[in-house]
Amino acid sequence: MWRLPGRAALRGVRSVVEQRSPAEATTHEAVRAMERAVVRCVPSEPKLSLSFALADGSHKNMQRDQSEPLGRALSRIATNALKGHAKVAAAKKSRKNRAHSSGGAACAATGSEPAATCEPVVKLYYREEAVAEDVLNVDAWQDGAVLQIGDVKYKVERNPPAFTELQLPRYIMAGFPVCPKLGLEFGDPASSVFRWYKEVKPGAAEPGDSGLASSSHSLQSSAWIETGVDERVYTPCNADIGLRLKLHCTPGNGQRFGPSRELESVCPVEAGPGTCTFDHRHLYTKKVTEDSFIRTVSYNILADTYAQTEFSRTVLYPYCAPYALELDYRQNLIQKELTGYNADLICLQEVDRAVFSDSLVPALEAFGLEGVFRIKQHEGLATFYRKSKFRLLSQHDISFQEALKSDPLHKELLEKLALNPLAQEKVLQRSSVLQISVLQSTTDSSKKICVANTHLYWHPKGGYIRLIQMAAALVHIRHVSCDLYPGIPVIFCGDFNSTPSTGMYHFVINGSVPEDHEDWASNGEEERCGMSLTHCFKLKSACGEPAYTNYVGGFHGCLDYIFIDLNALEVEQVIPLPSHEEVTTHQALPSVSHPSDHIALVCDLKWK
């Protein structure tokens, strides 16, 4: 009878190098051929789960208290097995009776009825010894144990890699990467196995080699053939148009694999829009940069919460085809555009929470980037960084209104603002936020960088509000880059809603703004809150001052910037923006070939 060994015994077991005799090897192979009984047991949860298939084909999922004695769990398994056997027997009897009835013969008793089936013997073995029934579940269900139900044996797998979530996008287009959304427990995507299939065209002859996976009975169908792609991401080609896709995947952790799963796309692959505004830009970004460079992207991707309003469809973007404003369509373009830049840093604005988790994370993670998110109200900011180049050290996000009201760092600024209560009220009503991530180089630990990302207040008459927000942002960035991490350089990305002629831009580039600047009265004299502002940074717009980064029917102008610290960084190259002809092919942005009303800024920076 197996019971929990003492600590000394456990140390002894761990110290012995396992060597299998021929008999043990045979036993090991037999165990490998067994059915699986999957146990999920997490210390932070009161219950464990047990999943296995009975001989009748039914699948059982049980939840048992971790602190429960094993005997109770085994008794419950026996009851379930008996019920399953009874159902099978009843089904057989029903079929037999129907067969007799159809032949016109009565079902006469030829003897006594068979005796009622007894509960099968259910035992749990570990190292070929039966586990005592008073051992608690948490200790009894060990990896490698054997569960026996009647004559059937199951290999117990405790906490194997498993998918907790697996989804394909609803809208799939030829030429655009398909990135499944994955939720993994006890595993990682890099150690998992993926295999893509596509439907056989209706009426097409099945190839001589179907290419179907022999390890999965569910794939033994002539309706599917292999695509030849065994990676997490699949990009359909024009030949796939009209066909659905299937993904077969097995979760792994580098040491073992868990139960496989498969899923099919809801809709067939559709034709893409042809040439997109970013296709030519991708010619400059075919490869990831070397370690001494930082390819940086700043992009307002247009939140779905704004794109789907009646005002957007009829007033802001009436020239845009309605289907091209739908998220299912736009996210294909966004994913392809962003992944094609092979960026090291990506700062995004107007990111819906669901878009971050369901679309951006799966797509960019598959290409080696990891992201953090900061919500504003209905949407927020996202910063992604290449994991092979950077690790995240800390985050220092703030809400401007909360920081102004409660953080001593902004006491002086708030006192100046309070001299005009009306202006103060307007500023403190705004929900704008600042996202700050401190990153460290994975190849040189002495290199750290402060990456800031923001989206300032949008209203055309909100110039003074943007000045206050920028002043608060630079004070907070100074605290992070000078006080918390002395001397680290700054990259400040965002949609600043300010053209190069505004006070905000003047303040950032020149280091100061006078109290008589016209933007202090941007919403009239009654809200004038003139003050002299300065900051200590030496900043430059890495992409210069393009004619526009936002192009809609009623406005175009430069609103987006990547500001860099000239003391530590320099610009290696700026990826050219789309030509004016490309931008206006469909009148303005967004369009069927461009997913946002803004244009991404992309540049390669270099450490000095």
Swiss-Prot record:
Keywords noted in UniProt: Exonuclease, Hydrolase, Magnesium, Metal-binding, Mitochondrion, mRNA processing, Nuclease, Phosphoprotein, Transit peptide
Function comment: Enzyme that cleaves 2',5'-phosphodiester bond linking adenosines of the 5'-triphosphorylated oligoadenylates, triphosphorylated oligoadenylates referred as 2-5A modulates the 2-5A system. Degrades triphosphorylated 2-5A to produce AMP and ATP. Also cleaves 3',5'-phosphodiester bond of oligoadenylates. Plays a role as a negative regulator of the 2-5A system that is one of the major pathways for antiviral and antitumor functions induced by interferons (IFNs). Suppression of this enzyme increases cellular 2-5A levels and decreases viral replication in cultured small-airway epithelial cells.
Example of a GO cellular component annotation carried by this entry: mitochondrial matrix
Provenance organism: Rattus norvegicus (Rat)
Transit peptide location: 1-16
Binding-site list for Mg(2+) 2: 495, 497
Biased composition range(s): Low complexity: 100-111
Pfam families reported in the protein's UniProt record: Exo_endo_phos (PF03372), PDE12-like_N (PF21171)
Reactions catalysed according to its record: Exonucleolytic cleavage of poly(A) to 5'-AMP
EC assignment: 3.1.4.-, 3.1.13.4
InterPro entries with a match to the protein in the record: CCR4/nocturin_mRNA_transcr, Endo/exonu/phosph_ase_sf, Endo/exonuclease/phosphatase, PDE12-like_N
Subcellular location: Mitochondrion matrix
Residues the record lists as binding Mg(2+) 1: 350
Enzyme class: hydrolase
Name this polypeptide is given: 2',5'-phosphodiesterase 12
Catalytic residues (positions): 495 (proton donor/acceptor)
Cofactor: Mg(2+)
Residues recorded as bearing Phosphoserine in the entry: 216
